[in-house]
């Protein structure tokens, strides 16, 4: 958990500003709120409300919440659409588009019934807009370029203003050149808290987005015309081991909210606990309509809020259950080499195809073994397909994977990583002695003249 300061810039005078739809007061046109940005890619502490009505803030996984100012009873925010550099995990950065220095953009938090005003400045090389996904707003504030508003041209600032009518979890993203801009990372979350602070209370409340990119090994910019063959599946534009853990106290009531802005569905699975889906795009789920789950599927454009009691201490995996979504970019679309003696084959092929990354002789787990990796130098700005280590060795995961760390005795606002879980004596799976004969593998018969083999540079992944 990083608590470093955000950068702040002076107020920008309201000159040459476009208005998104309705009439606004002279007070609103006097000045635009200051721009607040951050380049931090670690989870920030929850932003406690200092003005406006009280609420229990969320924690954005590997992200932050946008500060606001009160102006005559209206909550004002300033979003800046701009190119950003996002560290996806240590050793890899991506050149994306986002908001206020990051992709995804900052979380916006308001209270049910708030009058909200959002200034949007466009520092992109092309026009844009913002659609407030799932929210009941006036038609002229819906953010669909050409249909409900003029486009926000480069260098211009527009203003959106509406009432936050319904409590829930929402998303924001462009409805202008949507394929390019969303493939480049332009999205964020919006939380409208209940006006009754005692409604459905939880002790810890996390939120993040599911997004995906296609970035070739050695490159930095996503391929925006990719339809399904993405090779980086992320939580808030981070891949494991770059995704922070969600740290909670034992017996906390925990809520985790996530929205899906990828091009496919994701079955999200929590180990060690049962949960209930308590919120969807349409609002809160009545208690009589809930049932226990350990996995919930979230479709494209949907969000889900799940809740559970953290009564089982430990380091619990939390991930998408599509196995290819818990891998990083390396090793996709390469031949299956199980059982094939490779010896110096990797080095020889690497001289011809520098970005070639094979499957190991015994499986993909070799990708996380450092002795094997010594013979497989990584291309620039690339991370291994599966990586990360725990107290017992390689975790063999990547992509959409993190942990929920449950501990006794944490302070109320303590979100620091507590380190590895200390298992009670006798509660860890262990090796036992057996007298079974060793497993013999069937011998592979190589035809006369050798085996035919083709080599391809990895470009994306299988369609999933």
What positions do the PLM features span?
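Copper-binding active sites and cupredoxin-like electron-transfer domains
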Residues: 2-464
